[in-house]
Regions:
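Domain-level signal for soluble alpha/beta catalytic cores
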Residues: 1-261
Length: 261
């Protein structure tokens, strides 16, 4: 990662607006995606941003759902215990009227044209977890490399703690074994990004954001213990990768609602 004593280097955390983004089904999607990546790279450089990415356009503009299909051994389920944990938090209880109104109005999560984002899939792991995203990742890296090279360029991935809320375990003998299996799968993606010459950004929004969902009820000490196990899993996934190749942003939750807890 480049450092400077002459200027404050600038960057951002990944997601940039693609106002006329197609949904992926159009016949001209691939050339439009390539052109959009090229344009957003040029915009960042013309703006003076030093460390850039592809705006997460190759990921559909979403920091997490791009992982769908990259984790083997799991199947989609419509109703899981984890789904309840993610969407039922203290703020939803205290501000119940607001969340009811916002959910009906579609203002919590929306796209540039006002459409609500597609709900995330929820998965149940029924066999050994593996990484199956090699082709999708290779395509992302090729588009980014073609548009910008690899110097001062980052690509994003997801931390084990932030993938876990959307996955439920029906295979591993313990929570720890399940979590470290996720970490092993993600390790393959992390290493591929760095080996290709990019900086790796590991997004971990849910590590702190679950405080409102489950942490308050379990208490601070128990939540800290829970979080530490997930930090250890992330460190396991990152083992062997130089620290100066890694970016690690946390998030308090980016939905358009009250944030008081």
């Amino acid at each position: 990662m480049r450092r400077s004593t002459d200027k404050i280097l600038t960057t951002h955390t990944g997601n940039l607006p693609w106002v006329d983004a197609p949904d992926g089904s159009e016949a001209d999607f691939e050339p439009r995606l390539k052109a959009a990546v090229s344009d957003i790279v040029k915009w960042q450089r013309d703006t003076g941003i030093d460390i850039i990415n592809e705006g997460e356009f190759t990921k559909g503009g979403d920091w997490l759902s791009f992982m769908d299909g990259r984790i083997g051994g799991c199947e989609v389920r419509t109703d899981t215990d984890n789904r309840a944990a993610v969407f039922k938090g203290r703020e939803q209880q205290v501000f119940a009227d607001f969340y009811k109104y916002a959910a009906e109005a579609g203002t919590l999560f929306y796209l540039a044209d006002g459409q609500i984002k597609v709900q995330r899939n929820y998965w149940v792991c029924t066999s050994a977890i593996s990484y199956t995203g090699q082709d999708a990742l290779a395509k992302e890296m090729a588009l980014m490399k073609d548009a910008a090279g690899t110097d001062d360029v980052f690509l994003t991935s997801t931390a084990p703690a932030s993938l876990e809320p959307y996955y439920e375990n029906e295979f591993y003998e313990s929570e720890e074994a399940f979590l470290f299996a996720i970490a092993d799968a993600l390790k393959a993606e992390y290493e591929a990004i760095v080996e290709a010459g990019f900086l790796l950004q590991v997004d971990d929004a849910w590590l702190p954001a679950l405080w409102d969902r489950i942490g308050i009820d379990m208490g601070l000490e128990a939540f800290q213990k829970r979080s530490m196990l997930r930090v250890e899993a992330l460190n396991h996934a990152l083992s062997g990768i130089r620290q100066d190749k890694i970016r690690y942003p946390l998030c308090w939750g980016s939905w358009h609602g009250p944030h008081v807890f």
